[in-house]
Curated annotation (Swiss-Prot):
Gene: OR8U3
Family named by the database record: Belongs to the G-protein coupled receptor 1 family.
Topology feature Cytoplasmic, residues: 47-54, 121-139, 218-237, 293-324
Protein name: Olfactory receptor 8U3
SUPFAM superfamilies, sorted: Family A G protein-coupled receptor-like
Compartments where located: Cell membrane
TM region positions: 26-46, 55-75, 100-120, 140-160, 197-217, 238-258, 272-292
Membrane side Extracellular: residue ranges: 1-25, 76-99, 161-196, 259-271
Alphabetized Gene3D superfamilies for the sequence: Rhodopsin 7-helix transmembrane proteins (1.20.1070.10)
UniProt-annotated glycosylation sites, renumbered to this chain: 265
Chief localisation class: membrane
């Protein structure tokens, strides 16, 4: 019997967003600016919530974790994507690819359920304001944040281990700008049918369960707002959860576009464009949405800037006085 030599793949090549050389430099510049805004915006929001005691409430506790998750899953994707714009060969080692996939899945799933936790917080704030402090106690808030992190980590670990226990002995070109499950499975020389079923089963459960919590919460919220007689009261209720509504619409709208479009229109290139939006653009938009639409965040930002300017003036005065 003749021996068959099988060469196992240990390094993969990321196809990236574009292969056109004239677009590499402009794309690098655009994504560098977006990533810097993402880092500064989310770190700034986390710091602001930490230092301003007026923002030490359940809503901003969830928001600080949302900013952390946005920062993490953007950082899992964007830096490597930018490197690929300036190098000739966009390679990524086997274990680095596994790490990127695991981190991305962890933080993306966490975001889904954090948005659900925030929707529940809005529901309690508007529909049961008298019982808010009891229903949203510190212990409950910690649980509503800890459960998404733990569940997401376990699901991501499960998927990553199964994906990277498959055999890869053929082509090593991934038709994506990061290591995602479906484009990665296309390269495997093992039977991936069961793995594909698991992907859609878990993705379906995560999206349906988290979006159902969000949708149910907002049905009750809208019903409660419509029962408020004064226009001022309605505006106040809407402003409480307005930023969250915008964030939820953008995030779930993108995921629905990716997973619920007709199969005839579905392609990996379409997925790449949608992936750019929810891995790169949304993490940049979230802190801007909450900063521009939320009066308390704007007031806290103004207070922090005024204090910073005041400290700078005092420091400058002391330096000038020391010189003379």
């Amino acid at each position: 019997m003749a021996e068959v030599n099988i060469i196992y793949v240990t390094v993969f090549i990321l196809k990236g967003i574009t292969n056109r050389p004239e677009l590499q430099a402009p794309c690098f510049g655009v994504f560098l600016v977006i990533y810097l805004v993402t880092v500064l915006g989310n770190l700034g929001l986390i710091t602001l919530i930490k230092i301003d005691t007026r923002l030490h409430t359940p809503m901003y506790y969830f928001l600080s974790h949302l900013a952390f998750v946005d920062l993490c899953y953007s950082s899992a994707i964007t830096p490597k994507m930018m490197v690929n714009f300036v190098v000739e060969r966009n390679t990524i080692p086997f274990h680095a690819c596994a790490t990127q996939l695991g981190c991305f899945l962890t933080f993306m799933i966490t975001e889904c359920f954090l948005l659900a936790s925030m929707a529940y917080d809005c529901y309690v704030a508007i529909c049961s304001p008298l019982h808010y402090s009891t229903l949203m106690s510190r212990r409950v808030c910690i649980q509503l944040v800890a459960v998404p992190y733990i569940y997401s980590f376990l699901v991501a670990l499960f998927h990553t281990v199964i994906t990277f226990r498959l055999t890869y002995c053929g082509p090593n070109l991934i038709n994506h700008f990061y290591c995602d499950d479906l484009p990665f499975l296309a390269l495997s020389c093992s039977d991936t049918h069961m793995k594909e079923i698991l992907i859609f089963a878990f993705a379906g459960f995560d999206m349906i369960s988290s979006s159902s919590i969000v949708l149910t919460s907002y049905i009750f919220i809208i019903a409660a707002i419509l029962r408020i007689r004064s226009t001022q009261g309605q505006h106040k209720a809407i402003s409480t959860c307005g930023s969250h509504m915008v964030t939820v619409t953008i995030f779930y709208g993108t995921l629905i576009f990716m997973y619920l479009q007709p199969k005839s229109n579905h392609s990996l290139d379409t997925d790449k464009m949608a992936s750019v939006f929810y891995t790169v653009v949304i993490p940049m938009l979230n802190p801007l949405i909450y900063s521009l639409r939320n009066k308390e965040v704007k007031d806290a930002s103004k207070k922090a800037l005024d204090k910073g300017c005041e400290n700078l003036q005092i420091l400058t005065f002391l330096k000038i006085r020391k010189l003379y």
